[in-house]
């Protein structure tokens, strides 16, 4: 008896429509071989979302989408992020290296089903868990990095359970499951070469992949490797933002807080010059208010130094083997390793948030008294200083599967590790202050030395440093260092389950699955010694983290084929975290009913439980965000320091889905599902903007320069909390129609998701209707109401082509008002509307091997993404676009040659 995994008939329709794609030139041969395989192997069939075997005509009671390798190729996907970004059910994923909202995770990618968070979707590889990345997002969420999962050439298909699956898979499957399944029993060799070129800057991408497999009488070995090299795209190559959106009040030249008798501390623009050195004067009082001086700030354009696309190199390897023994036991093992390196652009130096004092005796001080410096060590005229990430992932998984007279069993072990290092340069607080006092330099002893004498030098923060009094590299090096965060995430999973028939019903045998699982997740984050002492002026620092979490689980599933038309699925899972978190029991009920041969109904309801992670309870981090200061009435680039919270409670949720499938005639299908997720005690990072809005003069939460009540905001202190609730609902619609004509086969497809509700209860912002909003001022994510993909595919013999039109609806930006001004105290005429966005992709491929009758297969593919080079809708914020929704790259053209031996 053989064991295999396949997609259901319903999911097969979704496979093409989900990505608005259909078959390429060589798809018919794949179709034929799949049909033959189905005829041979029908005894045991599994689909993602179930642990019991299914009959050949089974239709999943849960909404299940399957994207096969043909569909993946048809959109020109170079990596997994290219696939998930086109999914209409994916909202708010972090797949762009945006330094302002994704500070330390450049080079990674993730999935965010339904906008419920990148940690709420369980990502599997061949039905087994993968380790989460050791470096969390800005929101403190550790996620599975899909960039490190497996070479694209090894993927056979991606299966998505869209209604939540915690009752079967555990707490991480709150929003659903995405299961990447590799090719099995591959025999042969394949090499692919990809080249992609962007319309802006020097943004290019080269990918080389190889696949090899060999089969014997009882087993198979397969190996895959991929290498990716991507050049960067800087904001200066394609400026989408307005100048003021990427301008900081802390520049160099900078400003100085001077105590004015009877007035208090006022910011004074560098008297030696601002605009002359590339700065932008921002006057806060009319010229002449203070004779000879200008009240205000010297703005600095930091945006041009940052990158939309990081410079990246990736190596990903995967090896699998399976062997079938004579006693119907099959052994499988797989090993994967990934090495990712990324470098994203950064400003010459960060703002200095500690208000250091320039003494009255400083040789360049024109004020005659001590003043507080409000700026940065290096600004205009200097090169950018990038941040670097290094991510190394290792995964080993092995299992034994056995077949019995009435079912099968499986035992498995998985071990996966992610080592992640993030490095970013910053200024040291004490050393910078010493340099302003004249004790700068690594050889200077501030106890025995004299200011500005011998090895002791002054650092000159004034604009005379650009001309008559430049700074030496010796003094600059003495107060600059790199913050190094070395993190490690470790996952171990032991699992065993069995599935067997229990009794016969009208539609076949009822089947029962029972299983147990033990998993342990360890996380350690080692900050460098300087960070442990909070030595940096902007990124500050944090203590080290070292913690673990282990979970015992037992689960069961009962499949009841009541009759030929009615199937019922009952599932329940018990998980015990121990300690303060405790345990949970989460059930699921799912039903499918075939009313007629053409029309079927389905529905499901389930509960979920997500425990606080090690990082959320014990961790902490400092991130960089652009915030709107209601006191100053201006935007500011601010350090947000978040501390862990050991008092967090687990979050709980209930999800339900109802839908139907309608096939009025052959090759035409309509799928519609209504879904709803409702959370209580949602674990979130406090929204920094909401903290600032609710307590702008709270000195414990809001740190300001100069006057602690009215000075410019420098730092926000927040934590992780349990929000009151979140409820989101919507409709998924999929349709596909295959037409056979004399000119070839044409297949139009439509896939859409409409969000009807995204209601939030924010601890600071209160109740929010978040559907159709950016949700900048609350805990939510950007939620355009409608995403839609429209496609048309054509195939004729050795030729194939497809065109996709992708639409994202407009939505409100609650950070800005309709007139483009910042939302300080409310917008009388409503929020600024982010325009809807339409892009067109196209692809053509030809089977050169068939054309020239060669023994090998040579498939040439050419295509374009965003063919008309549409700019992403403008957003009045850092970088000028919404990195959670839109792609900043513009038109991308690509070519691929695939050779199979």
For the regions a protein language model found, what residue spans apply to each?
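Short acidic/polar hinge/loop motifs at secondary-structure boundaries
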Residues: 128-162
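Gram-negative outer-membrane beta-barrel transporters
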Residues: 567, 675-815
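C-terminal beta-signal and adjacent terminal beta-strands/loops
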Residues: 429-431, 756-757, 805-819, 846-901
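Extracytoplasmic beta-strand/coil segments of soluble accessory domains associated
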Residues: 85-129
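Surface-exposed, low-complexity loop segments enriched in small/polar and acidic residues
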Residues: 138, 233, 237-246, 276-312, ...
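Short loop/turn motifs that connect adjacent beta-strands in outer-membrane beta-barrel proteins
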Residues: 40, 150, 185-188, 201, ...
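N-terminal periplasmic accessory domains that precede
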Residues: 80-83, 111-112, 141, 145-148, ...
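N-terminal Sec signal peptide and the immediately downstream disordered periplasmic leader
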Residues: 2-88, 209, 213, 327, ...
């Amino acid at each position: 008896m053989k064991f295999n995994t396949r997609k259901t008939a319903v999911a097969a329709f979704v496979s093409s429509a989900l990505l608005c794609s259909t078959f390429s030139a060589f798809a018919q041969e794949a179709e034929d071989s799949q049909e033959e395989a189905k005829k041979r192997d029908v005894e045991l069939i599994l689909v993602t979302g179930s642990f019991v075997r299914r009959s050949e005509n089974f239709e999943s009671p849960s909404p299940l989408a399957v994207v096969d390798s043909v569909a993946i190729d048809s959109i020109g996907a170079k990596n997994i992020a290219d696939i998930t970004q086109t999914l209409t059910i994916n909202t708010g994923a972090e797949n762009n290296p945006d330094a302002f909202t994704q500070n330390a995770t450049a080079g990674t990618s993730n999935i965010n089903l339904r906008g419920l968070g990148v940690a709420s979707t369980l990502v599997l590889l061949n039905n087994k868990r993968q380790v989460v990345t050791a470096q969390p997002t800005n929101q403190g969420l550790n996620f599975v990095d899909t960039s490190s999962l497996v070479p694209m050439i090894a993927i056979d298909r991606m299966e998505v359970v869209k209604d939540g699956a915690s009752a079967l898979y555990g707490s991480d499957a709150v929003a659903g499951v995405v299961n990447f399944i590799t090719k099995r029993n591959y025999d042969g060799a394949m090499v692919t070469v990809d080249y992609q070129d962007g319309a802006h800057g020097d943004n290019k991408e080269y990918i080389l992949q190889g696949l090899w497999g060999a089969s014997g009488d009882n087993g198979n070995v397969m190996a895959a490797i991929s290498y990716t090299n991507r050049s960067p795209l800087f904001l200066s190559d394609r400026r989408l933002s307005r100048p003021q959106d990427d301008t900081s009040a802390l520049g160099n030249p900078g400003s100085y807080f001077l105590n004015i008798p009877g007035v208090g501390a006022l910011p004074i623009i560098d008297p030696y010059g601002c605009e002359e050195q590339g700065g932008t004067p921002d006057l806060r009082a009319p010229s002449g208010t203070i004779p000879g001086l200008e009240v205000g700030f010297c703005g600095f354009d930091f945006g041009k130094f940052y990158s939309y696309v990081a410079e990246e190199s990736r190596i990903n390897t995967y090896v699998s083997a399976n062997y079938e023994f004579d006693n119907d036991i099959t052994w499988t093992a797989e090993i994967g390793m990934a090495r990712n390196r990324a470098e994203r652009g950064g400003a010459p130096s960060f703002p200095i948030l500690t208000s250091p004092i320039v003494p009255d005796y400083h040789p360049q001080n024109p004020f005659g008294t001590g003043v507080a410096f409000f700026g940065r060590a290096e600004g205009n005229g200097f090169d950018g200083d990038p941040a670097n990430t290094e991510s190394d992932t290792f995964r080993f998984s092995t299992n034994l599967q056995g077949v019995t007279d009435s079912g099968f069993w499986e035992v498995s072990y998985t071990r996966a590790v992610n080592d992640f290092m993030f490095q970013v340069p910053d200024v040291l607080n004490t050393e910078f202050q010493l340099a302003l006092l004249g004790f700068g330099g690594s050889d200077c002893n501030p106890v025995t030395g004299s200011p500005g004498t011998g090895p002791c030098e002054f650092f000159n923060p004034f604009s005379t440093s650009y001309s008559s009094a430049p700074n030496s590299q010796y003094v600059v090096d003495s107060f600059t260092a790199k913050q190094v965060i070395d993190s490690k995430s470790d996952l171990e999973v032991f699992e065993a389950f069995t599935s067997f028939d229990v009794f016969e019903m009208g539609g076949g045998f009822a089947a029962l699955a029972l299983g147990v699982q033990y998993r342990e997740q360890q996380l350690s984050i080692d900050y460098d010694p300087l960070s442990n002492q909070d030595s940096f002026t902007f990124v500050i620092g944090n203590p080290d983290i070292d913690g673990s979490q282990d979970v015992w689980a037992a689960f069961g599933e009962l499949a009841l084929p009541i009759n030929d038309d009615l199937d019922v699925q009952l599932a329940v899972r018990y998980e015990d975290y121990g300690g303060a978190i405790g345990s949970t029991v989460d059930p699921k009920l799912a039903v499918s009913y075939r009313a007629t041969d053409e029309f079927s109904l389905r529905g499901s309801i389930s509960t979920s439980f997500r425990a606080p992670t090690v990082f959320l309870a014990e961790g902490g981090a400092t991130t960089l965000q652009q915030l709107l200061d209601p006191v100053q009435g201006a935007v500011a680039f601010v350090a947000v320091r978040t501390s862990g919270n050991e008092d967090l409670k687990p979050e709980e949720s209930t999800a339900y889905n109802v839908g139907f499938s309608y096939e009025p005639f052959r090759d035409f299908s309509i799928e519609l599902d209504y879904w709803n997720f409702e959370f209580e005690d949602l674990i979130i990072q406090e929204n920094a903007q909401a903290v600032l809005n609710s307590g702008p003069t709270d000195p414990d939460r809001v740190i300001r320069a100069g006057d602690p009540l009215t000075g410019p905001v420098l730092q926000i202190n927040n934590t992780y909390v349990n929000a009151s609730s979140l409820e989101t609902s919507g409709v998924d619609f999929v349709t596909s129609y295959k037409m056979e004509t004399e000119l070839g086969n044409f297949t139009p497809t439509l896939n859409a998701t409409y969000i009807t509700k995204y209601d939030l209860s924010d601890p600071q912002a209160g109740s929010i209707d978040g559907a159709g909003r950016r949700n900048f001022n609350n805990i939510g994510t950007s939620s355009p109401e409608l995403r839609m993909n429209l496609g048309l595919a054509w195939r004729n013999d050795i030729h194939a082509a497809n065109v996709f039109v992708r639409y994202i609806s407009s939505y409100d930006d609650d950070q800005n008002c309709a007139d483009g001004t910042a939302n300080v105290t409310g917008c009388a005429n409503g929020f600024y509307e982010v325009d809807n966005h339409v892009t067109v992709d196209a692809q053509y491929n030809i089977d050169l091997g068939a054309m020239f009758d060669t023994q090998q297969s040579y498939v040439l593919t050419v295509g374009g993404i965003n063919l008309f080079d549409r700019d992403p809708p403008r957003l009045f914020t850092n970088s000028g676009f919404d990195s959670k929704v839109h792609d900043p790259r513009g038109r991308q053209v690509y070519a691929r040659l695939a050779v199979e031996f």
